[in-house]
Amino acid sequence: RMRVAESRVEQWARRGADVELLDADRTSELLGSPFWHGGWMANTGGTVQPLAYTRGLAKAAAGLGATIHTQSPVTSIKREGSVWLLKTPEGELRADKVVLATNAYTDEVAPDLRRSIVPVYSFQMSTRPLSDNIRKSVIPGRQAVSDTRGDLHFFRWTDDGRLVTGAALFFKHNPTGRLPQHVGDRVLRAFPQVGEVSFDYIWHGFIGATLDKLPHLHVLGPGFFAWIGCNGRGVALAS
């Protein structure tokens, strides 16, 4: 697994990024845990609050003259002469250019596109606010963390001292009842100093996974583009 980290550091460094390869001791120092064998860090990285960021983008777009229609699912897209005809339950729209950015929620509007990804059900969870002592010992630098496991471990802090983590769906029966225990156990394996783990908030949805783990840009027709397959990193990749 360290070969993956070494490869990433080499790739990013060639492009001028400020990156650092971490041995086990340095990783333990940064994360407050000996759970990982090593890793790498992008020193210019950061985190955003996704909902606040989305609202900010919407406000900026509206300020530049964009019109945003919510609760208006497009049910079909067809070429009509030199434009595209988009139908919704309440009306129609004609456009010179169309961008389909529905990712894991791509439906029968573009069936071939839908079959190009694997929808994976992903859960995220936020703990109760944790004590100052815990916050000083668990990822004290407040970096966002993820690893190379298939069902990767990931962690980040919120402004009010909650640890956010999660997992992909493995349980078909009662997932919201069973996952908190599963994820809580993972937290304690990585950070036993947290003690009892309880989650105040749980949210979930689909991510669009691709076989090569890269997002795909498709040209579906004249002026008709699709962006799909963000593999759980849509906020960063789409920005």
Placement of each model-derived feature along the sequence:
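Flexible hinge/switch segments at interdomain interfaces of large molecular machines
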Residues: 26-34
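A short alpha-helix-loop-beta-strand transition element characteristic
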Residues: 11-24
